């Protein structure tokens, strides 16, 4: 099945929903598709990115997919709107992932999530030129799931046929990349530092609806347990906190 993200639902402090709306709809000019008191949602290419009010201070890592031939234009677009996060070792804001033939940049949103802009050479290239626009974003490229990677990887393989395509589920400091290039679930243990800030990963609820696959919703919690409920919308992966250095920095 495809690992394309149709909808990604994240928790956010209720008092930050206006600031998130200002960033994503105002500064980044994403289309606001769900402006109500219960949640806010934005159109990012093929993906709807939703923030739902919750307690605590949840934060996440996710990536916005840029056409492979538009990274420099997207970088200038982002630099005009947000503060890009530098590599603490080089002070550069562009991260070159040569093994993936990809380039990326990062910024924080008001909830503290680590948001990435990433372009994979050869993916979504349409030959556009000129100033970059939000409408060129292809969708979400990555969603971090803070979980037990071996159990989660097995559940995703068994229930959805999603395979590990890079990284490994072994080792406390490693990441596992499941799905396919440019549409990836990143499996990460709690406490493992996220690139580029080094902030330790924390498990917070996340729901991901994937394109394709059999009817039904697959619910995956942080412990790797899977259940299914009937729906016509497509499979959903849901991660929640469990009770009990990598190929790419993440």
Regions found by a protein language model. Give the residues of each.
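Ser/Thr- and Asn-enriched, surface-exposed coil loops between beta-strands
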Residues: 36-38
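Short loop/turn motifs at secondary-structure junctions and domain boundaries
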Residues: 95-100
């Amino acid at each position: 099945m495809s690992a394309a993200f149709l909808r990604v639902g994240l928790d956010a402090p209720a008092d930050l929903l206006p600031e998130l709306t200002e960033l994503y709809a105002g500064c980044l000019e994403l289309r606001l598709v769900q402006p109500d008191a219960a949640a806010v949602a934005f159109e990012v290419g093929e993906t709807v990115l939703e923030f739902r009010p919750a307690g605590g201070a949840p934060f996440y890592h996710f990536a916005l997919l840029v056409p492979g031939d538009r990274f420099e234009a997207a970088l200038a677009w982002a630099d005009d709107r947000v503060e890009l996060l530098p590599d603490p070792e080089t002070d550069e804001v562009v991260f070159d992932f040569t093994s993936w033939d990809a380039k990326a940049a990062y910024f924080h949103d008001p909830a503290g999530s680590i948001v990435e802009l990433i372009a994979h050479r050869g993916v979504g290239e349409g030959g556009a030129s000129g100033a970059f626009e939000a409408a060129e974003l292809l969708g979400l490229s990555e969603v971090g799931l803070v979980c037990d990677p071996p159990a989660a990887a097995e559940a995703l393989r068994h229930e959805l046929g999603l395979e590990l395509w890079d990284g490994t589920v072994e080792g406390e400091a490693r990441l596992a990349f499941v799905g396919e290039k440019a549409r990836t679930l990143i499996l990460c243990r709690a406490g493992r530092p996220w690139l580029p800030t080094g902030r330790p990963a924390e498990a917070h609820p996340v729901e991901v609806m994937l394109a394709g696959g059999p009817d039904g919703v697959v619910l995956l919690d942080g412990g790797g347990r899977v259940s299914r409920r009937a729906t016509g919308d497509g499979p959903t992966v849901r991660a929640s906190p469990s009770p009990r250095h990598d190929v790419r920095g993440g």
